[in-house]
Amino acid sequence: MAEPESSTAAAGGSRLRNACGGVLCAFTLLLIGVLAFSIRLFSVIKYESVIHEFDPYFNFRVTQFLSKNGIYEFWNWFDDRTWYPLGRVIGGTVYPGLTLTAGTIWWLLNSLNIPLSVETVCVFTAPIFSANASWATYLLTKEAKGTGAGLMAAAILAMVPSYISRSVAGSYDNEAVAIFALIFTFYLYVKTLNTGSLFYATLNALSYFYMVCSWGGYTFIINLIPIHVLLCIVTGRYSSRLYIAYAPLVILGTLLAALVPVVGFNAVMTSEHFASFLVFIILHVVALVYYIKGLLTPRLFKVAMTLVITVGLAVCFAVIAILIALVASSPTKGWSGRSLSLLDPTYASKYIPIIASVSEHQPPTWPSYFMDINVLAFLIPAGIISCFLPLSDASSFVVLYLVTAVYFSGVMVRLMLVLAPAACILSGIALSEAFDVLTRSVKYQLSKLFDDSPAASGDSSAESSSASTVSTNSAKNETRPEKTETAPKEKPSKKNRKKEKEVAESVPVKPKKEKKLLVLPMEASVLGILLLIVLGGFYVVHCVWAAAEAYSAPSIVLTSRSRDGLHVFDDFREAYAWLSHNTDVDDKVASWWDYGYQTTAMANRTVIVDNNTWNNTHIATVGTAMSSPEKAAWEIFNSLDVKYVLVVFGGLVGYPSDDINKFLWMVRIGGGVFPHIKEPDYLRDGNYRVDAQGTPTMLNCLMYKLCYYRFVETDGKGFDRVRGYEIGKKHFKLTHFEEVFTTHHWMVRIYKLKPQKNRVRGKLKKLKSGSKASSTNAAGRKKNPWQ
C-alpha cells in the first residue's frame, strides 16, 4: 500500500508544481507586457502626447478620415490636397492594417463610453502592440527551445532599442503593428510544423494576411518560409507536417493578399512572390515521390521515380520559362526598386536616387549594431550553437531567420528592426541554456555538499548500498527492453541496423557522461551567474537610456541642453500654425518632399509633393526649381500654382538635417529627369561648399537664397554653425520672392511668390522705347528686300 500512496503523492506534487509554474509564467508574461508598454512612454512624459516623425502624420490623417467617414468612404477616398495637380487615390495606395487597427480600437473604446480622441489612440497603438510582440516572441521561442528560453526572449525584446526606435508612444507607423504580425506569423508556422494541425495552418494564413495589410515587408515572410521548406527537403526532413505548414499558407495567403488593394495582382505577378510558387511545386513533387514509395515495391519505385522526376523537371522548366518571360517583359525584371536595392546595394544610388536619398535606406555603421542590439551581438553565437544541440525544424527556422535578417540589416538600416526579434530569440535561448547549466551545477554541488555532511554520515552506508542495488536493478531493467525493442527493428536494412545499434549502445551511457560534463565547480557557477546578471544589468541600463534619451524625442519638437538648461525648439509647429492661420485654404505650398505629410496634416494646405514619393518626375520638378536661379524657379512654381515656398534651415542653431545638407539629393533627382541640371556645376573640386569657394551656380540657386536671405543680419558675419564657416554670398536681394514668415530660431522660413508684373504696362514702355529707337536709326537702315 505504500507504493501506490507514494506514486499518487508524487503525481499530486508534480501537478501542483506544474500549476504553480503556469501561474508564475503567466504573471511573468504580464509583467513583461507592462514593461514593454511603460518603457515606451518617455516621449509622452518628457514632451506631450504628440505624433512623431513624418510618415505617422499621414497615417494619423488617414485614421481621422476613417473614423469620421467610415470604411466605405475610406476605400474610395481621392485626396486632392496632395501631389497637386495630380492628387492621390488613398484607398488603393496605402497599407490599411495600421489604420484599420487603430480605427477599430477607437470604435471599441467609444462604444464602451471611453471618449478618447483619435490622436490619443494613435499615440498609444505602438506601445500596446509592443507588448503583443513580446508575447508572440515568447510563443515562438517556446516552440523552438522551451518555456525558459521563451520568457527570456520576451523580456529582452520588450527592451531592445532597435524595436523601441519604431514603437515609442507617438511613432504611429506601419512597423508598430507589423513586427507583431511578423513574429506571430512565424510562430504559427513553427507551431504547424510541430503539430501538423490544419487549424494552425489556417490561422497562419490569416496572420500572414494581416501582415500583408500592415507593411510592405510581408515579402520577407513569403520568401523566408519557402527557403526554410526547401532547406528541410534538401536535408531529408520532409514530413506531412511540413506540407500542412506550407501548402495552405501559399494558397490561402496568396488569395487573401490579392484582396488588399495596394497589393492586388502583384501577389502573383511580381518576382518577390515567384520563389514561393516554385517551392510549392517542388514540395508537391517530393510529396508525390514519398506517396509512391509507400505503395510500390523497390523495383517499381525506381521506374516510377524516374518518371516522376522527368515529369517534375519538365513542369519546373516550363514554369521557370514562363517566369523568365514575365520577368524579361518588365524593365526592372519584375522587382520593385526597394527589392532590387536589397539584392544589389548599389542599384538605388545608380538608378533611383529618390530611394537612396532616404536616410532609412542607407547601410548601417558598426556602432549602430551595438546601439540597437547592444550585448545581444555577443550572445547570438551561443544561441546558434544551442539551436544545433539538437537541431529541429523550429530551431533551424530560427537560425535561418537570423542569417537572412543579418544580411538585410547590413544593406538597409531600417531593417535592423527585422533583425531585433531574431537577435532577442537567440539571445534568450543562449541565456536560458547558460542559466540552466549554471543553476544545475550549483544545485548539484549543494546537494553533494549536504550529502557529505557529518550529520548524514551515519546513514550513508545503508543509503549507498540500497542506491547501488537499485541502480544495478534499474540498469538491468533499462538494458533489457532496449534489446527487445531493437531486435525487430534490425530487420529492414543495414543502415537502420547500424543506427539502432548506435542508439541502443549510447542510451544507458549518455546520461552519466552528460552529468559529468554539465557539472561545473561551485565557484565557477556562482561567478558565471553573477556575470550574467551584471551583463543583464548593463543591458537594462542601456535600453532605458535609449528609450528615454535617444529615441523618445519627436522630430517635430527638438531639444538641446546647454549651461542655461534645456532649450525647446518648436519651430516646425510654429510654422505650420502660421500657414494654417494666415493663408487661404486653397493655397498651394511647395517644399521638399520630406515635409509634405506634416504640412498637409498640421497646416491643412495643399502640397506639391509628399513622402509617398510615387511620382519621381514631380519630385524632380521641385528639385529642379530649388536648383535653378530665382527667375527660372519662379516660373516653375508659378506653373504649378504655388503661392508659398517652405524651406528648413539650421545654420543659426546648428540643426544638421536642413535643406542645405539635403540639397545635393535635389540636384541628383532633378538632374535624373532634366539633363540641364548637372551635379558638378554645384561642386568645387568635387567638394560641396556654400562659402566663398562655392560655385556661382550654387550661390545663385533658389535654395541658397531662400535659406541665407538676411542671414548676415544675425551676427554680422553670416557664420553657418552646421557647415562651420561663413557663407559666400552675404548681401543680396530677392526679386521674385518675398519673405513672409521666419520662425523664432530661423529653422523654418516661408516665402511668398510675388505676383506677375503688369504685362500691358511693360508692353507700352517697350513700344515707346522701340518707336524712338526705330525713328533715330531709320535713316541709316536699309530696307529688307524680303519683306
UniProtKB/Swiss-Prot annotation:
EC number: 2.4.99.18
Site feature (Important for catalytic activity) residues: R166
Compositionally skewed regions (Basic residues) per UniProt: 759-769
EC category: transferase
Cytoplasmic side stretches: 1-18, 145-146, 196-197, 235-239, 294-306, 389-394, 438-525
Catalyses which reaction(s): a di-trans,poly-cis-dolichyl diphosphooligosaccharide + L-asparaginyl-[protein] = N(4)-(oligosaccharide-(1->4)-N-acetyl-beta-D-glucosaminyl-(1->4)-N-acetyl-beta-D-glucosaminyl)-L-asparaginyl-[protein] + a di-trans,poly-cis-dolichyl diphosphate + H(+)
Annotated TM spans: 19-39, 126-144, 147-164, 176-195, 198-212, 218-234, 240-265, 274-293, 307-327, 366-388, 395-411, 416-437, 526-546
Pathways per UniProt: Protein modification; protein glycosylation
Pfam family, one: STT3-PglB_core
Intervals of motif DXD motif 1: 53-55
Lumenal-side positions: 40-125, 165-175, 213-217, 266-273, 328-365, 412-415, 547-787
Motif (DXD motif 2): 173-175
Sites annotated Interacts with target acceptor peptide in protein substrate: D55, E360, K662
GO molecular function terms attached to this record: dolichyl-diphosphooligosaccharide-protein glycotransferase activity; metal ion binding
Membrane topology per record: Multi-pass membrane protein
Domain of life of the source: Eukaryota
Subcellular location: Endoplasmic reticulum membrane
Family: Belongs to the STT3 family.
The name this protein goes by in its record: Dolichyl-diphosphooligosaccharide--protein glycosyltransferase subunit STT3A
Lineage, top ranks: Eukaryota, Viridiplantae, Streptophyta, Embryophyta, Tracheophyta
